[in-house]
A protein has these predicted regions:
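Conserved lysine of the Walker
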Residues: 13
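The conserved Walker
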Residues: 9
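Walker A (P-loop) ATP-phosphate-binding motif of ABC ATPase nucleotide-binding domains
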Residues: 2
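Conserved nucleotide-sensing/catalytic segment adjacent to the nucleotide-binding pocket
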Residues: 27-82, 87
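A glycine- and Lys/Arg-enriched "phosphate-lid" helix/loop adjacent to the NTP-binding pocket
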Residues: 87-139
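Hydrophobic anchor at the beta1->P-loop junction of P-loop NTPases
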Residues: 5
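Hydrophobic positions on the alpha1 helix immediately C-terminal to the Walker A/P-loop
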Residues: 16
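NTP-dependent small-molecule kinase module
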Residues: 23, 130-178
Length: 178
């Protein structure tokens, strides 16, 4: 089974992807971990796509977590399940700010980010929060279009609440035992 987990920052993608990995034992590729080890150049973008392709062809089953719409089309085509997490924008902002504060206080990095990655309360961070706030109107139409073009609506599972996530994980546990 090939699973992608998408959704705005703060929607719970990384957490859900790790839980799916615990249940299935499929290899997991967190795209933030991959991308934020680069210098963000044009060469890095090519490498980023190649690494995703290599991961997908090297593993019969996998989980890829992250949006990155520039490379999403190929992942949508390859995936058996598209898990799209949708949460209200205020909740996503709250979660992102809270995890940033926790990281600053605890001085720990996220497991889905490189050790060297650090967030600062600067203009770039505020732009990131603005990106999250406007994700629904600026990014969701592109994602919906990619899903439609790939004729992948039958692969799509939209999860909006903790309960829906838990029900999905419970169902996945049952499926993975069979």
């Amino acid at each position: 089974m090939k699973i992608i987990v998408i959704g705005q920052s703060g929607s719970g993608k990384s957490t859900l992807a790790r839980k799916i990995k615990e249940i299935t034992d499929f290899p997991l590729l967190p795209l933030d971990l991959l991308w934020h080890t680069t210098d963000y150049s044009i060469q890095a973008k090519k490498w980023f796509l190649q690494e995703q392709q290599l991961f997908m062809v090297s593993n019969p089953s996998w989980i890829v977590e992250g949006n990155y719409t520039s490379t999403l089309e190929e992942r949508i085509k390859e995936a058996d399940k598209i898990i799209w997490l949708k949460v209200p924008r205020y909740l996503a902002i709250y979660r992102v700010v809270w995890r940033s504060l926790k990281r600053k206080i605890n001085k720990k990095s996220r497991p889905d980010m490189p050790e060297s990655f650090s967030e600062k309360l600067n203009r770039e961070y505020l732009e990131f929060l603005s990106f999250i706030w406007h994700f629904e109107e600026n990014n969701e139409p592109k994602i919906q279009q990619l899903i439609q073009v790939a004729n992948a609506r039958n692969k799509l599972i939209i999860l909006k609440t903790r309960r829906e996530k838990q029900e999905f994980l419970t169902k996945l546990k049952i499926e993975s035992k069979n």
